[in-house]
Amino acid sequence: MRTNAQAAGLKDAVIVNTCAVTAEAERQARQTIRRLRRERPGARIIVTGCAAQLSPKKFADMPEVDRVVGNAEKLEPGGLVGDDGIHVSDIMEIKETAGHLLEGYEERTRAFVQVQQGCDHRCTFCIIPFARGRNRSVSIDRVIEQVQKLVSNGYK
């Protein structure tokens, strides 16, 4: 997301990546958004993540929020910019796993490679299939490519 934000020319923007696992996580996300607006009144606040995917209108209705972006759209080059308040598609229509960008690990000792996204189980207690979509696997060639890139950058 950082690369996409920089490429789009977003200068004074804050991206809030929300969680929907519990009501408390959503409450904390809304609290964080309100605090960020107080601390950075001129910043563009963009909300994404699972809670935003599931309840885009709830976040778009917050006066502090400038844009709500879905889980698929946050990885698109132009997904973070635009004047429409809500840019969220039907996650169940996504058939492929977006290329996971290997970024943001420069100062870290660990990095992660995404191999799968979504879930096909419909456990009665779990919201993940509705926030992340159906199970989609990254191709083995893409996983190997990502691992090789990390190894060449010094990760073990």
Residue map of PLM features:
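Proteins enriched for Cys/Gly/acidic motifs involved in redox and nucleic-acid/cofactor modification
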Residues: 1-156
